[in-house]
């Protein structure tokens, strides 16, 4: 009788252990499923990071005209300017995009606020997206609001990852394998470095 009781207890323990393991596996599967379902961009974490980055690039002097305006085509502004520098030990590239009736280098120089349509930013975040050179992408309105695509998704994070059209797919074609067109030797743009110029050498390998 005693042996039977011990056996029954053992069976119960094994059963409970199996149940606990099953529940754990179920939770892991659900967590994995949620991660798989999570969009590559536009999450709360992405937007929060983008908002903080806007404050920092504004304070660091990345916004406004610095004198290297040039003409370009879509999807960016007809007139644009690229500046780069380091914020929080991260390489940051800021492109101001100008457009509208009468836009030209001369008109933008005279009244940049009138023609500014969007500010697009790339932030190098170590380990963020190894498949795509660890760039964080974001598109702002002139007032710093994170803009949305036609589906209502906020354009911050791994924007359009895995899609045939969008930031990542377009920049993959940039020469030098760094996803940055303004580092191309043939591009018709000069890039202004903002802030401590000694940091430029430190980040030189990221700008080839």
Model-derived segments and spans:
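Polar/charged alpha-helical tracts
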Residues: 2, 45-55, 197, 201-205
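Hydrophobic helical h-region of N-terminal Sec-dependent signal peptides
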Residues: 8-17
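Homeobox/homeodomain signature
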Residues: 10, 44, 125-127
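Sequence context surrounding c-type heme c attachment/ligation sites in exported
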Residues: 26-38, 90-208
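Bacterial N-terminal signal peptides that target proteins for export
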Residues: 1-8
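Sec/Tat signal peptide C-region and signal peptidase I cleavage site
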Residues: 18-22
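N-terminal secretory signal peptides
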Residues: 24-104
């Amino acid at each position: 009788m005693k042996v039977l009781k011990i056996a029954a207890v053992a069976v119960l323990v094994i059963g409970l252990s199996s149940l606990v393991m099953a529940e754990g596996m179920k939770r892991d599967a659900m967590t994995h499923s949620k991660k798989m379902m999570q969009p590559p961009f536009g999450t709360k974490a992405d937007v929060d990071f983008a908002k903080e980055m806007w404050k920092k690039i504004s304070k660091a002097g990345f916004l406004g005209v610095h004198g290297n305006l040039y003409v370009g085509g879509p999807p960016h502004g007809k007139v644009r300017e690229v500046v780069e520098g380091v914020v929080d030990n991260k390489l940051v590239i800021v492109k101001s995009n100008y457009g509208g009736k009468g836009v030209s280098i001369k008109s933008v120089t005279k009244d940049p606020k009138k023609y500014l349509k969007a500010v697009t930013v790339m932030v190098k975040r170590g380990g963020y997206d190894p498949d795509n050179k660890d760039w964080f992408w974001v598109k702002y309105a002139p007032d710093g609001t994170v803009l949305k695509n036609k589906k209502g998704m906020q354009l911050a994070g791994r924007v359009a990852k895995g899609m045939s059209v969008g930031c990542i797919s377009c920049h993959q074609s940039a020469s030098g394998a760094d996803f940055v067109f303004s580092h191309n030797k043939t591009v018709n743009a000069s890039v202004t470095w903002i802030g401590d110029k000694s940091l430029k050498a430190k980040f030189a390998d990221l700008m080839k």
